Regions:
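Conserved hydrophobic/aromatic packing and binding residues within compact polymer-binding modules
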Residues: 21, 35-36, 46-49, 75
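Short C-terminal boundary/hinge segments that cap the last helix of small helical domains
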Residues: 69-81
């Protein structure tokens, strides 16, 4: 199986952000699908974000943060960034 060539895949910062998104999502009782619908992004993309596989655009970070009840800064803080 071929490896992903995306140079951002699994960067520590993306993994930390993904873990923070997953943790907050679970804390507030949202499924990936519910978060995706609320943020108007695909559910499979949310899964990839939570695994640190996607280099998110700022607009998507802010949309996800808002849907999780956080500001972008609060989400970054939760991720240790």
């Amino acid at each position: 199986m071929a490896k992903k060539s995306n140079r951002y895949s699994y960067a520590p910062e993306l993994v930390a952000l993904g873990k923070a998104i997953r943790l907050v999502r679970l804390e507030i009782g949202l499924s990936q699908e519910a978060l995706a619908l609320s943020a108007e992004i695909d559910r499979s993309y949310v899964g990839g974000i939570e695994r640190g596989e996607h280099n998110l655009a700022l607009v998507n970070i802010l949309k996800l943060a808002r849907c999780l009840g956080l500001s972008g800064a609060q989400l970054m803080h939760r991720a240790g960034l």
